[in-house]
């Protein structure tokens, strides 16, 4: 009898224990499980200015995506699963400023992670090499004063490069010009840098042409963001006008004094002729190279270093002494009459503060050595190269979708 009671007692406690164990086991199965963790091997990348490719390992128990790329920072894949390697390629930074991109890795579930890419700025200025095309307009193909020999054009750019890379004062603007080798469709040019075009007239007004919105005139110009266009024809304006040029545009987020806002032109074409116009009467002269270098200065954002009359004007550069051009020309005539056209005094100017200096600046007119730029002019040219939407080469630009909507389409300024 005692044995029977003990057996029943053991059975009772066995049932209780099993119930407790089952309850504990069931609780573990019902409890929410933590989401698998996303692991990124590198959260901060610091590529060098020359550009670099970084290898990042992403670990996750499931699928994930990576986004936030820019035109200069790109992963080799946008999605993956489980453990995978992503190659993040960072292009060369040609600008002096540090730039930052933040990539976001999003898991299928759980918290996302970030990869900050912080690239150092360039240690020296990027060398801009700008292709130049001369559009030679002619009515009579046999007339050598209209359809000019290509040898005249080949000699112009070396003079320009000497001025822009190695001026009299040793200042290097970091820009070179070369004869374009291919047209916009990628076809090799029979004559490098020369595009010969039968035209409706042997001469025309340079001012009317360079401000024209006529479809035929605009179609003549190759894409300004890829070429420097120089259109060569005989001007109907009076003698003494060798060339004129459009001025570049600036940007709203980094404006430059004297230039118009061209944000809209990052996303749409310019609706007028945009070029340098060169008078055929002057392009065959010995000083034509310096004339082109002067007009390229306008094309890259520089103004004249003088005032046209008594009213003080500015070129927005503090290191270029200003002078009264009209008063100088009167004095020059007196010097020529008394001492002849070779007098060294013709190269002297009297600034608006009374200082006397020798004219060497590329943005002056005769009589001048025209063989140097100043540090402030250098800053303006670099600004235009790095920001202007209608200049060849890489620019620092915002997203076109953000800057084109609602902006006006201003015409270009014209300089001679």
Report the location of each language-model feature.
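The catalytic-center signature of Zn2+-dependent metalloproteases
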Residues: 274-372
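Extracellular/luminal low-complexity segments enriched in Ser/Thr/Pro
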Residues: 85-100
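Surface-exposed binding patches on compact interaction domains or structured appendages
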Residues: 59-87
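Active-site-proximal segment of zinc-dependent metalloprotease catalytic domains
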Residues: 213-307
């Amino acid at each position: 009898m005692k044995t029977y009671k003990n057996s029943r007692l053991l059975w009772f406690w066995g049932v209780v224990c099993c119930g407790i164990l089952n309850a504990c086991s069931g609780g573990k199965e019902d409890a929410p499980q933590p989401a698998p963790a996303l692991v990124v091997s590198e959260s901060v990348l610091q590529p060098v200015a020359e550009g670099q490719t970084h290898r990042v390992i992403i670990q996750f128990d499931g699928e994930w995506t990576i986004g936030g790329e820019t035109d200069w920072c790109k992963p080799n894949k946008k999605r993956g699963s489980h453990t995978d390697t992503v190659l993040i390629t960072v292009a060369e930074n040609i600008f002096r400023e540090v730039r930052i991109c933040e990539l976001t890795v999003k898991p299928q579930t759980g918290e996302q992670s970030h990869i900050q890419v912080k690239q150092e700025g360039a240690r020296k200025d990027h060398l801009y090499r700008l292709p130049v095309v001369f559009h030679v307009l002619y009515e009579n193909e046999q007339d050598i004063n209209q359809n000019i020999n290509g040898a005249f054009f080949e000699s112009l750019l070396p003079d320009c490069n000497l001025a822009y890379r190695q001026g009299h004062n040793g200042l290097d603007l970091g820009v070179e010009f070369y004869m374009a080798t291919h047209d916009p469709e990628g076809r090799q040019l029979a004559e490098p840098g020369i595009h010969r075009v039968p035209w409706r007239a042997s001469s025309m007004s340079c001012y009317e042409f360079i401000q024209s919105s006529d479809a035929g005139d605009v179609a003549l110009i190759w894409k300004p963001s890829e070429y420097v266009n120089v259109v060569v024809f005989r001007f109907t304006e009076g003698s003494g006008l060798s060339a004129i040029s459009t001025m570049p545009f600036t940007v709203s987020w980094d404006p430059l004094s004297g230039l118009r806002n061209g944000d809209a032109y990052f996303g749409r074409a310019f609706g007028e002729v945009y070029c340098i116009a060169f008078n055929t009467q002057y392009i065959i002269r010995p000083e034509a190279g310096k004339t082109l270098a002067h007009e390229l200065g306008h094309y890259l954002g520089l103004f004249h270093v003088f005032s046209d009359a008594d009213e003080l004007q500015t070129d927005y550069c503090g290191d270029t002494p200003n002078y009264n051009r009209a008063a100088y020309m009167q004095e020059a005539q007196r010097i020529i009459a008394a001492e002849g056209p070779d007098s060294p005094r013709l190269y002297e100017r009297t600034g608006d503060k009374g200082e006397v200096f020798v004219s060497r600046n590329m943005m002056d007119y005769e009589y001048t050595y025209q063989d140097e730029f100043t540090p402030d002019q250098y800053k303006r040219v670099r600004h235009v190269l790095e920001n202007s939407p209608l200049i060849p080469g890489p620019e620092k630009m915002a997203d076109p979708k953000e800057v084109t909507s609602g902006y006006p389409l201003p015409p270009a300024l014209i300089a001679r």
